[in-house]
Amino acid sequence: MSNSTVGKLKGFIASKGKRTKIAVAGGAAVVVAVAGYLLVSSYASGFFVSVDPENATVTGNASVVADASASGGKAVQFTGPASTGGGGGTGGGGTGGTATCTGSANTPGGSDGMGGCWPGSNNTGVPSGTALSAYTGSCTITTNNLTIDAKTINCPGDLLVRASNVIITRSKITGHVVVDTDVSQGYSLSMTDIEIHADGDLPVVYNGNVNILRANISGGHNALECQEHSSHCSLRDSWVHDQWQAPTGDTHLGGVAHFGEQVACTGTGTNGMTAVCFDIEHSSVVCDAPVNASGGGCTGDINMIAHYGPIPGAFIYKNLLSANVGASYCTYGGEAPENGATRIVYQDNIFQRGTNSKCGSYGPVTGFKFSHAGNLWTNNKYNDGSTITCTAADECL
């Protein structure tokens, strides 16, 4: 969507009623009625608008514009940050208009070449202007369908989720977030417009059954790590960066990781692909920790390594993978000595070349086998536009 015209509410000029505050959630259709008059559903991203139908005024991220198709000839036009579309049918890219980006093209926050911006500091995390208050609830969540909004969450250990359908929005979290799928595969968590930072040699968010949208995640040895009892793991329109690093020791760091399944996968990609275990879409995935004194450092940006079981489905779509000569490869495609990977789809991703022109120390990708059923490598390119060609060998060069 465009950063200017992302949708209109039609017909409010002709209606009568009290001032109404309209919250339009990112990627969701919203229908608003004022004094019995149906306005119109629209798609938008993080907008909060006050409409005064009686005086025909509107304030917030919107303006009144002429529209011959609207009742009364006028409509409300929303304005604001471009949606990258991670919750929509195209999987991100903001192809509906020209977005206002920060930084160079094909860097976090910069142009993604698809009419939108890569996720970065300018378009992830808590929306600007959000007033946060301290979270006073338990750091072990056991209430199903709980929603936490606009909070600062500081748990001395972990924020532990032992409930289903927990939702956290517009919040800043310090510490690790754990969905305890080892206890129950029914536990699940969704997080939108959040900032999370955690120190120490653990993932920031793990074990799985999690959907993350427009997040700014830093620290940990992985931003998101999905393990064997996770039925789905999704990261969209998000920025992961600045991993924790010890001064010495054999550290193995990454952006996001999946280490194999022992349960059936239930996720769905925006292309309609079903039974997806690991869904990473339109995200800036950066492993930028330096190599330490012992040679420990980044394994890669997106790492699928089937240690604990096979990986039977992954959708890696329209992501920016950051170059780091300290990393072996920028992505691992699922293979491991213990298990294999099938239905692994890499599509329309951009790999930074970096200083050695190969993204990682040895190349862009390893552990991806064409011989396994459903594996697909299509239209993946370096940031200079050149195609990364894969052959039927184990590695792409």
Model regions and ranges:
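N-terminal Lys/Arg-rich, disordered targeting/topogenic segments
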Residues: 1-16, 281
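N-terminal carbohydrate-binding/catalytic regions of secreted carbohydrate-active enzymes
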Residues: 112-201
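Extracytoplasmic
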Residues: 13-25, 35-85
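Extracellular secreted precursors and ectodomains with disulfide-bonded cysteine-rich loops/domains
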Residues: 99-100, 115, 137, 263, ...
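Leucine-rich solenoid repeat scaffolds
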Residues: 350-397
